[in-house]
Amino acid sequence: MTMGLSRLARLAALAAALLATIAAPALPVGAQEKPRTGGILTWFDYGDPGRLDVHAESPLVVQQATAGIFSGLLQYDPDEPSKIIGDLAERWTASADGKTYTFHLRKGVKWHDGQPFSSADVKASFDRVLNPDFKSPKCGASLKPMVASVEAVDPNTVEFRLKFAAAPFLPSIASAWCRVAAKHVLAKYGDLNAAEAQIGTGPFKFKKYERGSVIEWEKNPSYFVPGLPYLDGVKQFILVGGPTQLAAAKASKIMLWDAWPPMRKTQADELGRARTDVDIYQAPINTVFFIYLNAKKPPFDNPDMRRAVNLAIDRQELVAKSLEGAGVPCAILDPKLVGDFALPLDEVAKAPGCRQPKDADVAEAKRLVEKHYPGGLDVEVAVRQVGNYVDRGQLVIAQLRKIGIRGTMKTHESAAGYAAFGKGDFTIIASQDRSMDVNEPSGVFHIAYTSQSGSNYGQYSDPKVDELTERALKETNHDKRKQAYWELQRYLLTKGDHASIAVAWVEGWFFKDKKLRNYKPGLTTYDNNTFMKVWIAQ
């Protein structure tokens, strides 16, 4: 695929390409394949989720593990992934001032345990994620700045009252993380972590979870959309590490690789030589490669030391060596994904820490370190053992050594790493990709930069960042909103002392088995993975 394509254009081109492969079998002119029921789709998770609470967790593996189990009020259309359509809500209206949204719910929907669904479940779910004392790093982080209250008007009607008219509200409600859980299940279990608590209204029922091995769904025969799903089930193998994942793909153990971590070019080429029954494609995945510094303890409670790391990190080298060139270095927003809300890349390339050659920035970084630590210093550099994080971490350690910061690697199992990072138990996280919840410019700031961000692991707070983010969120005029986001990006790039350092927007290679039909990639790595309309051809 052409690297310059926007996400939407890329989706359209990919959909056309996949449609062409569907049409490839010998069919009469004008004939269409009839969806076939049955079969198991095989897929993979990059790690063991451990915990399964979609409201309280942020790892992709949690969302993937539960994607087909729960429904939302809204969803992104499986047939047209840029379009928001109803899910549990059959229709909705907005007030003239854009501050009140009323959702009219489907009638007759049942939970997987046979209990009836109602507006009480919607209110319980969103009251939970909006509770100031409840940490909801995805759905809650998106909605808390916008939503004032949620009311159940009657058993089939829910009303959301906003603090202000907000363009990202509907995309956030349609997010794959803003799923509706059963009030009676929350009351019984207290959270959604147990396999027994995975009781949804989605196209599939939770069947099995073997830690470190496999997650399985089975068809929900009482799904509220007649005739769906087509599949009998979905099997997700837990495959840790690129070599293991690639070996499974080459051996035809999995039919789809559509999520993080993407294949690198060399892996995609190797797969292409091993299998001719797959469609391989390149795409951005709405994901940022971050380095995090712990701003709550030495040495990175010192803004000079945070600036030193920001100056020293060679983003271009990290993209070239760890992503094989498939990424957009330095950008806080990627123009391929959010258009002109992103600061022009030629301006970004001149920012401290991004400009090439690196000599002047490295010299200044070294001066700042020597000012506070004349003999240099030793630090622990943490990564989770997923993707190619360890390799990235070694590159980061080598770059920091040039300015007198001597790093020692500490690796974590995936779930244990998330737990440690969430508690602030680290000094540097050398590599942590964060995927956007919605294809919307506000997403990255609510994920990693504001004081209340769900993935602001460094716990750094800058009132100016919070103020600019809120101003951009409230603005409804496109040009004024663009200027607000430009000001915010310039501020972060110029000040250079934030504890969340954006290395690059990640791109990569993916594949689908040619037998899969009705599959289209979503706007984010979290979307369109319920597989409600996917079927397997013979």
Where are the regions a protein language model picked out?
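Surface-exposed binding/hinge segments that line
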Residues: 33, 104, 139-186, 208
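Alpha-helical secondary-structure segments
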Residues: 42, 118-127, 155-161, 202-203, ...
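Ligand/substrate-recognition segments at binding pockets and active sites
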Residues: 43, 211, 241, 258, ...
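N-terminal lobe/hinge region of extracytoplasmic solute-binding protein
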Residues: 44-96, 127, 197-200
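Detector for C-terminal structural segments
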Residues: 60, 64, 210-214, 219, ...
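Gly/Pro-rich hinge or "lid" segments in bacterial periplasmic/extracellular proteins
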Residues: 78-79, 174-229, 233, 363, ...
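Aromatic- and charge-enriched surface segment that lines or borders ligand/interaction sites
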Residues: 90-135, 153, 159-161, 245-248, ...
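Extracellular/periplasmic solute-recognition and catalytic clefts
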Residues: 149-152, 207-218, 235-297, 320, ...
